[in-house]
Amino acid sequence: MDCVNISWFLITLFAAIATSTMHDGENNNVGKMLQEPTYLQSEMIESIMSRHLESFSLTESDFEDIIFMKPRSKCVKDALKDIIPECMRLGVDSIEPGLQKKAAIQLSICEFENSKVTYPSSCYNMINDNDFDSCIFDIERAPQYWTTFSGYYREITKICYEESLPFEKEQIISLYSNITKLYSKMFQDLNDSYKDSTHIQQMMKNEFKELQRMMKVILDQNEKTSEEVKEKYEEFSEQYSSMLSTSLEISKKFSLGTENLVEDMANNIKYLDFELSRISIAIEDLDFETKLTDMKNSVLDDVRNLSDESISLLDSILTNLESLDILSQDAQNITNGISQSLKKNEVLSNNMNNALIETDTQLHEHNEVIRFEFEETISYLSQFSDQAIDNAIRDTSEEITKHVATFIDSINLRLEETTTKLEEVIYNIDDLSDKVGNASSYLIEGLNLLTSNGIMDALLLTYNNVASGLESGFGMLTTLKSDIFKIVRFITACILFAILFIWSMNRLFSQNRTKHTTLSSISPIGILNFRRIFRFLTNLALWLSVMGGTLLAVIVTNFLIQLKVYISKLSTND
């Protein structure tokens, strides 16, 4: 009964410890679940285990002493081992004569051996019934042997009564001895499992601390990189906003200057028309038709040359515009890539947070599984069955091993996924940096294209050729050349710069006007406004043609005025 009480006490103790530990684990987070027991708790648990191990050792020694306190010899036990169970099972009256005869012969031989009396050789090594019959036949010949045999044969029933209780006691002692040894082994295994679980718990705690530290470092680096990219993008947007504002101001100033120039040219055309009408009336009687025809042909040749050079210049401008369109598309693609990279970084951050939450959930489930398995183990132990206890211990070990392996595999999988996602974040950050660098290079290339000297040199060459042709044909534009050249060069440069810059900015920001708050208040030019600008440029080209014709008219008028003065001088001299 002491063994039973000790066993129940141990089971109750372990159930209380397991329930308390699991209850504390449910009320704490992942970090507290992995927290090792305090020093006082460890000392208390070790003290309890050592005390009960000593109790088991003392109980085992007591059982050994009880087993060694045998009232009879081994020979007597062997002689009665077959008849006592039958006597207890069926009763004294149901003992078979053959079994009773065998027991009486064996008891007689035990007495002969204890008394060191020689007995017949046929009674040695008896195996089957014939051997026993031969032994009885030889014993019957000697009266002293037969007296001993017959006495034991008659006393079998009495011996059965006397030996039933000691036999039952031995069976009970053997049973409880086996149970005590089993519980001792189970307790030792539980003690070893507790030590192993403490070691594993400490290892898992260290690994989770290292994982937490690594995740914190990675998140800090990611946040720092995101801030740097955000600052660079804001600076880039501010520069674009400033350039766009400057281009809008230049466009407004150019529009006002163009309107004033058109008004002045209209007034000059009206004045020239009036003067030409007067001059045409004055020279009707003069014979200058041949000279005027030559002058007209020369002027037409110069105009054709100017037209050819203008066409080639327009082709060059269209080529540059196509290049600028390609650069604008590349800048647009880079901007889209930057936006997609930022979205990917956000998705990866959300996935990392979800992975941490799933890890927390799996730890909680792992704790629940351990508690459930421990409760199942306790329920099996309460049945006092050797087979049930062995099966429970084996199943519990397999389940715990399986769940621990599954949990470790899950952690390794989460670590691999986290590593892959971190590599993707680093790759996206590098790609983002390359795209920002490409965007800066494209911007610089576009600005260099806008300020390229090739277009300006072509315009200067065209107007120099026109001016030199007019000057060589008439010799009357020395004073007018420099002023007209400066005005036309300034107007042309402003027009080309405004057209190229506004067109490129429209292509770059037409689909990304809501990407940043700095640009949210600036509306793109749009297709309709671009058509208006193109229509304006067409009218401007027509106006330039009119201006060329007007310039030609001014030259002709100047020539006619000088001719009139010359004729007047000749008339005065005559």
Curated annotation (Swiss-Prot):
Biological-process GO terms, alphabetical: karyogamy involved in conjugation with cellular fusion; nuclear membrane fusion involved in karyogamy
Coiled coil (UniProt feature): none
Transmembrane portions of the chain: 484-504, 541-561
Lumenal-side segments: 21-483, 562-574
Membrane topology: Multi-pass membrane protein
Topological domain spans for side Cytoplasmic: 505-540
Compartments (UniProt record): Endoplasmic reticulum membrane; Nucleus membrane
Residues carrying sugar: N178, N191, N305, N333, N438
Keyword line: Endoplasmic reticulum, Glycoprotein, Karyogamy, Membrane, Nucleus, Signal, Transmembrane, Transmembrane helix
Chief location: endoplasmic reticulum
Signal peptide span: 1-20
Function: Required for nuclear membrane fusion during karyogamy.
Family that this chain belongs to: Belongs to the KAR5 family.
Protein's name in the database: Nuclear fusion protein KAR5
